[in-house]
UniProtKB/Swiss-Prot annotation:
LRR repeat spans: 108-131, 132-155, 156-179, 181-202, 203-226, 227-251, 252-276, 277-301, 302-325, 326-349, 350-374, 376-398, 400-419, 420-444, 446-468, 469-494, 496-517, 518-541, 543-564, 565-591, 592-615, 665-690, 691-714, 716-738, 740-763
Gene: RLP31
Name of the protein in its database record: Receptor-like protein 31
Provenance organism: Arabidopsis thaliana (Mouse-ear cress)
Superkingdom per UniProt: Eukaryota
Known glycosylation sites: 49, 64, 88, 95, 112, 117, 154, 178, 202, 213, 313, 346, 364, 429, 482, 503, 516, 642, 673, 697, 745, 765
Location of the protein in the cell: Cell membrane
Signal sequence extent: 1-23
Amino acid sequence: MMIPSQSCFCFFFMVSFFLHTLASPTLRHCRHDQRNALLEFKHEFPRVNESNQIPYDVSLSSWNKSIDCCSWEGVTCDAISSEVISLNLSHVPLNNSLKPNSGLFKLQHLHNLTLSNCSLYGDIPSSLGNLFRLTLLDLSYNYLVGQVPPSIGNLSRLTILDLWDNKLVGQLPASIGNLTQLEYLIFSHNKFSGNIPVTFSNLTKLLVVNLYNNSFESMLPLDMSGFQNLDYFNVGENSFSGTLPKSLFTIPSLRWANLEGNMFKGPIEFRNMYSPSTRLQYLFLSQNKFDGPIPDTLSQYLNLIELDLSFNNLTGSFPTFLFTIPTLERVNLEGNHLKGPVEFGNMSSSSSLKFLNFAQNEFNGSIPESVSQYLNLEELHLSFNNFIGTIPRSISKLAKLEYFCLEDNNMVGEVPSWLWRLTMVALSNNSFNSFGESSEGLDETQVQWLDLSSNSFQGPFPHWICKLRSLEILIMSDNRFNGSIPPCLSSFMVSLTDLILRNNSLSGPLPDIFVNATKLLSLDVSRNKLDGVLPKSLIHCKAMQLLNVRSNKIKDKFPSWLGSLPSLHVLILRSNEFYGTLYQPHASIGFQSLRVIDVSHNDLIGTLPSFYFSSWREMSRLTGEDGDFRLSEAPYMGKVLNATAFFVDSMEIVNKGVETEFKRINEENKVINFSGNRFSGNIPESIGLLKELRHLNLSSNAFTGNIPQSLANLMKLEALDLSLNQLSGQIPQGLGSLSFMSTMNFSYNFLEGPVPKSTQFQGQNCSAFMENPKLNGLEEICRETDRVPNPKPQESKDLSEPEEHVINWIAAGIAYGPGVVCGLVIGHIFLSHKHECWFMEKFRRKKPKVVTRIARPSKH
């Protein structure tokens, strides 16, 4: 007979064993109807890859009848009822749409449904509303289109609704107000539009609201005080308007508020708040239309870590009061109209400061010595202001400083050598004229980016720069350096990506130092006095995208060997002494990646075979075709460093003696300029293959024969100059259909027959057709008031006196926009804070002058 204690032990053991058996999904089979519904759902996606070799989070290889469905990957069953309560197929490539009668909707007991990153497309079926027990619905990172169905309101138990990064459109349904248990609403990166429904105010349990990067408009709800649990509020990059919703900042739990990139206006006003949010840590109000002064009430947010008020219309003086906030780490005031001196005072309470950006304002006076009290400072951006004087010695005390941007000010004097320990030094467009103690401390240099362009430096090229062995980008353009380029620059060629020395007085040959320059993207030595030949070591620059040697005295055969560089997009040899033929039968034609080529005003000769342009694939590939150019690939159109900003490049046009500069070369610019040489023979018929060509200048040569009919295929052509040749025959009537062509010149040839009667032709000046006696149909074009005398044509290569009738399209080398340099690094520190794909947004900003960008959080 058992003693009582033994009986109790046996009883509890049996009960525990029974409960364990009941709860174990592996010991209890799932219901047949659940299994069949799952298999039906699986069979709706016949192209799903079930290979275990593919590193997806879940595969469907385990979904077969020989295995209990509660053990299938991604499936979770209730321990008692064996109903499927969770389905997580994240990253399984379903590659199909959700069908309205899908087996998925037979799983009536689902609580959690995660189909993120499954390559789903098509509409969200309204039958999704049948899964009324859902508490979590995640359809993020797919290609879903259409509107959110009103049946979403049936999911009244939802606490998490995530539709991030799809292609959904239209207004949100009013039924969304039925989701009264919702805590996480994530609709960012879609195309939603219209107003926020009034029923949105029912969602009082919300912790996170993320509507970032849509097209919502109108005003935000005036009263948001009902969202007492709200922690994260992100409506950035929409079209909301009106004034700042003050009630938002009375929510005591609010920690993160992002309203940037909208059309809010009026003053930034926090007054009359009974209970300011003491938890607020991140406030982003940039890229709106706020005006007036920065309110001193901001200083009441004593937990504030990051404040971004950039690119508004704020006025007033420097907001010294901000620097009383002890937790403040980042302040961005760039792109406003703030004036006066910068005065920090004795504000050591803000010792946490890591980032200060006051660029593009109207601050003046000296840079304050007191900035040195912020010992944790990593970035200091003061570009585009009116600062004067010299760089304060006290800044050298900032041991953690990495990025120092002072472009476009009125600074003078010497550049101190302690700057070389930083990562980035950008001092362009000032009046610096010397270097202090340049050789000291260079063995410990860390500088990777050095921009000394557009200052007053003169004399021989400084050899001490060769000791900056970590350099990646060196910009010394637009100064008065003379003498030769030192061969010792080879010391950092292994790391260099950009070497910009244009517009100085450098002489001698370009040194043969590029054997190890495998990372070099851009080389610009234009507008100097260089002579000799192009160094053959350039053939090792396999990454090179831009080569500009314009306006020198280089005397060499045309470098057809450059055609083997796989990434060469821009080649500018203009105004040198290159000679010989472009086409060399023994060499590969190459130049498959060229987008801009300018060999004008040289001494090139010979004929071009009819197939000459047939290998120029980049100019023949229509935008949007497979493998299309990405902005981030080309420094002349958008050079990226740390995915944070871009260079600005230019295109110049000499028209009737006036040189006009376009401030931006974008990915659509495709240019050929062969003018001012001695090419002869027919214009190659293969020119018609270059479907993307925008500007074609073959003027001032000796081309003969007819104008190729294939030119009519260049539907994107905007400018055509065939003047000063020996062309004969008729102007192809098909050219009249080129609707984008606004500028043309056929003068000084032997053309005959009728001029096309299209609007593009009839709108030209008479001078575009002069000295073609047999042309007819010019009555409307050459009215008496438009007639001009026919000057004797001159074929001089002197760029200072161009003929009035000649249009020379020039793709200039990298014309770095002032202050753009600083933008290249601002996101480097911020990437861990807001985690946005900064670069793609940068090139879609509503404000074209923006040069800085703060990164985004993990979800928008």
